[in-house]
Amino acid sequence: MKKILIGTATYNELTNIEILINKINNLELNLDIIIVDDSSPDGTSKKIKELKTKFSNIILIKRKNKTGLDTAHKLIFKYANHNKYRYLITLDADLSHDPRLIKVFLKRIKNYDTVLGSRYIKGGKNELTGWRFLISKYGNLIIKKILNSK
């Protein structure tokens, strides 16, 4: 069984993707990185292909159309399940999620079924405003209730 898969979705993340991949690989963990790109017109997938020559742990799925974050995450989850990864961690490609927390999540998961990071807990950073803030805040409360999490 493969152990760790890091998943991210991209659309026009050319300026961030190399930084993200380097930060993840600098953790020196045995992991794979799957990136679902929605045919970014800025050259994101071309940059990922270049990075694949440097890092053998990168998996790129380039979709023909922009079909959104939710379907990208579904694809990542299906890939993880099909390829029997033990752990899956999703990060935003825009660097709003700190890859250094991957080690914290992996340490915590040993005692739980699920670990969920949130910008609303102590130490979290929230820069959302207006409707995005409300949707995110209440969406997280609903997820916590469904998962019966603390």
Regions found by a protein language model. Give the residues of each.
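Acceptor/aglycone-binding surface of glycosyltransferases and processive sugar-polymer synthases
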Residues: 61-82, 87, 99-150
